[in-house]
From Swiss-Prot:
Keywords: Adaptive immunity, Cell membrane, Disulfide bond, Immunity, Immunoglobulin, Immunoglobulin domain, Membrane, Secreted, Signal
GO MF, any single term: antigen binding
Gene name tied to this protein: IGHV3-48
An annotated GO cellular component: plasma membrane
InterPro entries associated with the record: Ig-like_dom, Ig-like_dom_sf, Ig-like_fold, Ig_V-set, IgHV
Post-translational modifications reported in the UniProt record: The N-terminus is blocked.
Name the UniProt record assigns to this protein: Immunoglobulin heavy variable 3-48
Length: 117
């Protein structure tokens, strides 16, 4: 019985650590077609510099769509064909932050954008 209680306690501790991970996006807004926006994602609760990061988006009534990827060091970057040449992903490991510069915005870029590990 005592071993069982210890196991439950250990699981609770691990779940508590997981719950401290936070990714908070900001920078959205309304712009005209052809305009620009810069999204930011502030990370906390984990070693940001050790993780590859992504931007994904969800247009109204649609599923999740992957937008862009950046390696932990920032040396490797990929984009979805739909945003290539218009969007730029970057990161600042010293500030635990991820960015997405979006230029030449189109109506079809309308979506909720999320950063993801």
């Amino acid at each position: 019985m005592e071993l069982g209680l210890c196991w439950v306690f250990l699981v609770a501790i691990l779940e508590g650590v997981q719950c401290e991970v936070q990714l908070v996006e900001s920078g959205g807004g309304l712009v005209q077609p052809g305009g620009s926006l810069r999204l930011s994602c502030a990370a906390s609760g984990f070693t940001f510099s050790s993780y590859e990061m992504n931007w994904v988006r969800q247009a109204p009534g649609k599923g999740l769509e992957w937008v862009s990827y950046i390696s932990s060091s920032g040396s490797t970057i990929y984009y979805a064909d739909s945003v290539k040449g218009r969007f730029t992903i970057s990161r600042d490991n010293a500030k635990n932050s991820l960015y997405l510069q979006m230029n030449s915005l189109r109506a079809e870029d309308t979506a909720v954008y999320y950063c993801a590990r």
